[in-house]
């Protein structure tokens, strides 16, 4: 294994060994405390632009499942078509793996996808640094390459300045019905022609426009198994002239302030006060911005399978899967909106709802993948409104 160094923005250095693809990369260094789920996390588009640190000490011992596509066009075991994280950082990588569904090692997968992996890092110490300082930019440099670079002069683009949503969103309109192969349509298709085509796909199903900010596969699956037709559109596509029954705003990476086009489209959709709207993760933030609230960056974010949230107005507490670095400022919610969920660890917002209209959202991931599915009922609540 080749020597490799993780260099943080504050000058901190962590030395380890490479077990993935060997190339220098830069990104925002974050940590995830989940014990399992690295195939799902690595393929989650919300990790785009980030160096993902796993705090669980042993990683790789159950290998990687096959990349297979179901008849409905969805990946069976992954959350997208490829790895989106810039790199993975672990304490102890297991070269040996054993699982009934594994087809290759984590190292082989990383090399094939050209994604670096570091092992031998003191991830507890790294996590403490990020916890005290907050997440920061960092770079992975390989042995002799490090000596060729003046790291004091190393410049890395700020994570919040890049529109990662634009990088991971679909570039066409994709229509899913749940069983058949999806229909792919160019975004240049005239609205009248598009509505005509959509009306012939399956007129018996309710139609949901899904704004793809970096949607996870299991979100699509959770909608489709509730017998709705999903019209997946790019993040900045103006869908307001389409004929549909509900609006879904997906998860996604980066700073929501880079997605003003999506916010403006949501505001136009909100002119129809009877239109059901549901957002998850980035969708919660964009819906909040459309409603007039402000967003702020968390010190080190929520990335784990065990985040407790309470439904406001009740004593019901749910354990949720989370992956976000930004949150809605509850104090900026206008009088028509109120918090729906609150994080029991730090009191931050975990969802909002409108007091009169059928609009609500969750900052956590009710679809899980991976993690607990305690809150998947939110998809049922949305479909009931259609």
Predicted regions and their residues:
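Active-site-proximal beta-strand elements of phosphoester/diester hydrolases
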Residues: 207-212, 320-321, 360-364
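Short acidic/histidine-rich motifs immediately flanking catalytic phosphotransfer sites
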Residues: 242-249
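Cysteine-nucleophile active-site neighborhood
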Residues: 251-330, 371-381
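Residue-level detector of beta-strand face positions
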Residues: 5, 308-310, 351
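RNA-binding accessory domains that recognize and position tRNA/RNA substrates
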Residues: 1-199, 203-228, 232-236, 256, ...
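Catalytic beta-strand/loop cores that center a nucleophilic Ser/Cys/Thr
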Residues: 315-357
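A glycine-centered loop/beta-turn motif at secondary-structure junctions
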Residues: 351-386
């Amino acid at each position: 294994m080749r020597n490799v160094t993780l260099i943080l923005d504050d000058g901190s250095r962590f030395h380890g060994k490479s077990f993935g693809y060997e190339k220098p990369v830069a990104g925002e260094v974050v940590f995830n405390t989940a014990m399992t789920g690295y195939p799902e996390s690595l393929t989650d588009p919300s990790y785009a632009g980030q160096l993902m640190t796993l705090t669980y000490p042993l990683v790789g011992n159950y290998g990687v499942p096959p990349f297979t596509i179901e008849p409905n066009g969805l990946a069976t075991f992954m959350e997208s078509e490829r790895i989106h994280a810039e790199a993975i950082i672990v304490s102890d990588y297991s070269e040996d793996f054993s699982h009934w569904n594994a087809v290759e090692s984590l190292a082989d997968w990383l090399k094939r996808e050209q994604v670096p992996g570091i092992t031998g890092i003191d991830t507890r110490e790294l996590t403490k640094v990020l916890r005290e300082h907050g997440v920061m930019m960092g770079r992975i440099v390989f042995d002799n390459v490090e000596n060729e670079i003046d790291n004091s002069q190393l410049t890395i683009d700020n994570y919040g300045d890049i529109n990662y949503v634009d990088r991971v969103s679909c570039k066409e309109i994709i229509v899913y019905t749940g069983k058949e192969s999806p229909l792919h349509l160019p975004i240049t298709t005239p609205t009248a022609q598009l509505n005509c085509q959509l009306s012939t796909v399956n007129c018996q199903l309710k139609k949901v426009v899904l704004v793809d900010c970096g949607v996870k596969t299991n979100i699509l699956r959770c909608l489709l198994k509730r017998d709705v037709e999903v019209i997946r559109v790019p993040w900045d596509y103006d869908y307001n002239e389409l004929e549909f029954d509900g609006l879904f705003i997906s998860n996604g990476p980066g700073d929501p302030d880079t997605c003003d086009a999506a916010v403006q489209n949501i505001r136009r959709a909100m002119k129809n006060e009877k239109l059901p709207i549901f957002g998850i993760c980035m969708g919660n933030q964009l819906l909040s911005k459309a409603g007039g609230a402000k967003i702020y960056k968390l010190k080190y974010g929520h990335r784990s399978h065990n985040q407790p949230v309470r439904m406001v107005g009740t004593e019901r507490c749910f354990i949720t899967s989370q992956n976000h670095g930004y949150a809605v400022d509850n104090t900026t919610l206008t009088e028509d909106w109120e918090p729906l969920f609150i994080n029991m660890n730090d009191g931050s917002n975990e969802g909002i709802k409108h007091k009169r209209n059928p609009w609500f959202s969750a900052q956590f991931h009710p679809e899980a993948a991976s993690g607990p599915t305690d809150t998947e009922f939110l998809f049922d609540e949305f479909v009931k409104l259609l």
